[in-house]
Amino acid sequence: SKGITGGYLPLSVVLTRDEIYQAFYDDNVTKGFLHSHSYTGNPLACSAALATLAIFESDHIIEKNQDKSVYIQAKMQVLANLPIQHLRHQGMIHAFDIKTNKPTFSRDCYAAALSEGLLIRPIGNTVYFMPPYTINETEIDFMVDATMDIIKKVI
């Protein structure tokens, strides 16, 4: 909820198809589906979001992330030598599953990564990469290479 404001304030955005919107819509606001909270319409959060979106556009963040994502995918091919499956990604989020029955894999992987200066998110047997958009190729190399070494140690 903070990403759209550049991390300054909580703000969320809801997107939906028109047919779903119409199912909840009513001209009478007392009968329509109302969803709001204390952050609704916060002008400072909205201003931060607009500034963040302007930076995304002027600095071509999406295009740069597409290139970074392709680089990450190519780099992750080194993991093919490990017992992994279901290598996948959506944008800058990359994930794969480790073939292991070790019940402490997630905890062991997290601790080993942290000791190497790497913050990764294993959930069960699934390892996720969700790098910041500012990541560079040297950092991507470290992220993937260190993860490969860590997995070898903990499985």
Locate each region found by the language model.
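Conserved N-terminal phosphate-binding loop of PLP-dependent enzymes in the Aspartate aminotransferase
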Residues: 1-155
